[in-house]
Regions:
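Glycine-rich phosphate- or other oxyanion-binding loops that anchor nucleotides, phosphorylated ligands
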Residues: 60-96, 103-107, 155, 162
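Mixed-charge interfacial surface used for oligomerization/domain docking
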Residues: 3, 9-17, 22-23, 27-36, ...
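N-terminal glycine-rich anion-binding loop in soluble enzyme alpha/beta folds
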Residues: 3-70, 74
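Beta-sheet entry/capping signal
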Residues: 1-3, 88
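Short beta-strand->loop
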Residues: 93-95, 125-128
């Protein structure tokens, strides 16, 4: 038996966390000097959406927000509990080239394994991405576990998936990318004036890079739809992830348009994690799906 862990950047809604028996370790943000836990396991989907709206309204209003890492001590305590219950540990991480979280978990895992106190194993999978790119892989792992597949078999299969799991997104305001150094302040101002909406993606090394520029929000949303429909493989077997930073109507639009073109197993449509979402800003729409690789083909 094994436990499946994610950090709250994985964006798995609370009801699915319970259904798939996934353990979530939450980021904690400082909002105007007060701690705010990013994941609440007891919220309904409606409450999650309202909390997301309230949070991103605070971001729009200029709240002072600081994000941080989950400490190695928190990881160590969580992993130890599973090991002491005679269970292996499988952890799906936010890309180590986006966050230092992977390293925190690695330190915890090494300390536990080097102690010699446990016969069970810890395996970590770097999603090379963020948000539902992590979450969907964790859900697939849970489904394999439910079928009775062995720990190493599940981990071996899912270790091959980050190279195929695509994440593409567009933002509402370029100033948030400028704050994180992904765009110059001057370029952000000019881009906003001209209504330039970049399409960004996670590349094969787990870095966020620009894919192309679109003129206007609707054009950017349609480009996201095209990228999903043109690059997804075996969509009828896949869950497509949609994470939005208080852009619910736009999330419904892209979901409905995709269904006009391809038949998919299902969607997860949820509010963007507050930690990573703070860096991309309100009105961001991100989409996650499996392709043959991460070399995207655009509109056809």
């Amino acid at each position: 038996m094994f436990e499946i862990f994610v950090d709250s950047a994985a964006n798995i809604p609370a009801e699915l966390v319970k259904a798939f028996k996934i353990k979530v370790l939450s980021f904690v943000n400082l909002v105007n000097g007060k701690e705010m836990t990013c994941f609440d396991p007891d919220l309904t989907p409606e409450e999650e959406r309202q909390k997301g709206k309230d949070y991103y309204d605070m971001v729009r209003a200029g709240a002072n927000i600081k994000t941080g890492l989950i400490s190695s001590g928190v990881f160590e305590d969580a992993f130890r509990e599973a090991l002491e219950a005679d269970k292996d540990v499988l952890y799906f991480s936010l890309s180590k080239n986006i966050s230092g979280n992977y390293n925190s978990a690695r330190i915890a895992a090494e300390d536990l394994m080097e102690s010699g106190n446990y016969t069970r194993k810890i395996r970590m999978i770097d999603s090379l991405n963020a948000s539902l790119a992590q979450g969907i892989l964790a859900i697939y792992a849970s489904e394999m576990r439910e079928k009775g597949m062995a720990f190493d078999e599940v981990a071996d299969i899912l270790e091959t998936c980050p190279a195929k799991m695509n994440g593409v997104f567009t933002v509402g305001d370029l100033k948030y990318l400028a704050r994180t150094g992904r765009l110059s302040g001057t370029a952000a101002v000019i881009g906003n004036v001209l209504s330039i909406k970049p399409i960004l993606r996670g590349n094969k090394d787990g870095y966020i890079v620009q894919y192309k520029k679109c003129r206007g929000r609707k054009s950017a949303l349609n480009e996201l739809i095209s990228l999903v429909c043109n690059n997804i493989v075996e969509p009828e077997k896949q869950i497509i992830g949609i994470a939005h930073a208080d852009a619910y109507e736009d999330s419904l639009y892209v979901m409905e348009e995709i269904q006009k073109h391809i038949k998919v197993r299902g969607f997860i449509n949820t509010s963007y994690d507050f930690c990573t979402g703070s860096h991309v800003g309100p009105d961001t729409i991100a989409m996650f799906f499996m392709g043959n690789d991460r070399e995207l083909q655009g509109m056809k």
